[in-house]
From Swiss-Prot:
This is DNA replication and repair protein RecF. One of its GO terms (molecular function) is ATP binding. It comes from Streptococcus suis (strain 05ZYH33). HAMAP family: RecF. It is found in: Cytoplasm. GO terms for cellular component: cytoplasm. Belongs to the RecF family.
């Protein structure tokens, strides 16, 4: 798949922008704070409806504006697919082929993206929430049912936490109803994640071995508060853990077990990668990003769009070369950079856009 055209209105520092892309490599060149990353962010939002840089939609609005729109013309093997997102203070409207989508899970997955940004280098050592978000973003694009189950789980989780905070006199029967719903949706979320990580480990290990010259091996472990055993139904096990945690939950007035608390651990040659060297961290994150591309290709039969946000300067020459080797005419790629000196072995066929104070000009 590839994005032919992007139109922005009142997005960040862009009042209006209409830009056509190369189906292969597109480079946004300019100094910092000129608007390079904003364009990449808009592509990400077009794919996933939310930004990777902020949780607040208002941050995406141009100063003193109350609504914004992002439109794109996507090419897939099945044909052209117009995509539209309109954001206001009342919420968001998403359209595919000019038809309004009632559910988020009906929209996400039409345009798949893999983002590699400097903050991704914190994936291994950062907080568990980063690793949960990593799974949610990638898995949500290739499995709409996961988004639906996750949304339902979060809805019941919010209900349960609100109820725990609202009263000191608990209706045990009502709480048991919430627990049953939480266990049903939560067990599905956990199983989706485990299945995804098994595939990611398979693809990721290939990349780790390529980069390390077969000296390193990757294993991935999903760490959950719900004991995973083949002989016990996951829902029943979830309910057991909720029962064990009930006294704690009543005291702290929140839910202490479930996929919202889970984590992922990465191991290189059996050693937790949290304690690996900086070079190993970077190689591992690069391997995971390359694995995401191949995994999405296997599931969707099309390569995703690759977004590289000022990450090349964070990689040494060898890792840059390994990353740029993936950039072919079959993978549309967007790169932001302050200098072409950071880029090695660029393909001959590409577009370079100069960005200055929100103005975009294409190199001749």
């Amino acid at each position: 798949m590839w994005l032919e055209r992007l139109e922005l209105q009142h997005f960040r520092n862009y009042n209006q922008l209409d830009i056509e892309f190369h189906k292969g490599l597109n480079v946004f060149l300019g100094e910092n704070a000129q608007g390079k990353t904003n364009i990449l962010e808009s592509i990400y939002v077009l794919a996933l409806t939310r930004s990777h840089r902020t949780r607040t939609d208002k941050d995406l609005l141009q100063f003193q504006e109350k609504e914004l729109s992002i439109s794109g013309l996507l090419h897939r093997t099945s044909g052209k697919v117009p995509l539209d997102i309109h954001l206001t203070d009342k919420g968001r409207v998403t359209k595919v082929n000019h038809l309004k989508q009632a559910k988020l899970s009906n929209y996400i997955g039409h345009m798949n993206v893999v983002l590699f940004a400097p903050e991704d280098l914190q994936l291994i050592k950062g907080a568990p929430a980063l690793r949960r978000k990593f799974i949610d973003v990638e898995l949500g694009q290739i499995k709409p049912l996961y988004l639906s189950d996750l949304s339902n789980y979060n809805h019941v989780l919010k209900q349960r936490n609100t109820y725990l905070k609202s009263t000191d006199k608990i209706d045990e029967n009502f709480l048991s109803v919430l627990d049953q719903q939480l266990a049903e949706y939560g067990s599905r979320v956990i199983q989706h994640r485990i299945d995804f990580l098994k595939k990611l480990e398979e693809f990721g290990n290939r990349k780790v071995q390529e980069i390390s010259g077969n000296r390193e091996e990757l294993t991935i472990e999903y760490q959950t508060s719900i004991e995973l055993t083949d002989d016990v139904n996951l829902i029943d096990k979830f309910l057991t853990e909720l029962e064990k945690s009930r006294k704690r939950d009543l005291f702290k007035k929140n839910t202490g077990v479930g996929p919202h608390r889970d984590d992922v651990a990465f191991f290189i040659n059996g050693m937790n990668a949290h304690y690996a060297s900086q070079g190993q961290h970077r190689s591992l994150v690069l391997s995971l990003k390359l694995a995401e591309i191949e995994l999405m290709k296997e599931v969707t039969r099309e390569y995703p769009i690759l977004l590289l946000d000022d990450v090349m300067s964070e990689l040494d020459n060898n890792r840059q070369i390994k990353l740029l080797e993936t950039i072919t005419d079959t993978i549309q790629t967007f790169i932001t950079t302050t200098s072409l000196d950071h880029l090695h072995k660029l393909p001959d066929s590409l577009k370079i856009f100069h960005i200055e104070s929100g103005k975009v000009t294409e190199s001749e």
